[in-house]
Amino acid sequence: MPKMKTLKSASRRIKITGTGKVMAFKSGKRHQNTGKSGDEIRGKGKGFVLAKSEWARMKLMLPKGK
């Protein structure tokens, strides 16, 4: 059986915490921020925990857990 490979697009968008939770990051922070408030831009920098129903699927995309 061949090695499991990491889905690179997923590795850039999500991460698995030390306790096994799956975190993602909010979109809309990279460019075109002139009309947004500072609170909005800072709020988009924080990650959030995905729903438990999605954890198993995301962990298949990241077999090494990174």
Curated annotation (Swiss-Prot):
Keywords: Ribonucleoprotein, Ribosomal protein. NCBIfam families: rpmI_bact. PROSITE patterns: RIBOSOMAL_L35 (PS00936). HAMAP family: Ribosomal_bL35. GO terms for cellular component: cytosolic large ribosomal subunit. InterPro entries: Ribosomal_bL35, Ribosomal_bL35-like, Ribosomal_bL35_CS, Ribosomal_bL35_sf. One of its GO terms (biological process) is translation. The gene is rpmI. Belongs to the bacterial ribosomal protein bL35 family. This is Large ribosomal subunit protein bL35. GO terms for molecular function: structural constituent of ribosome.
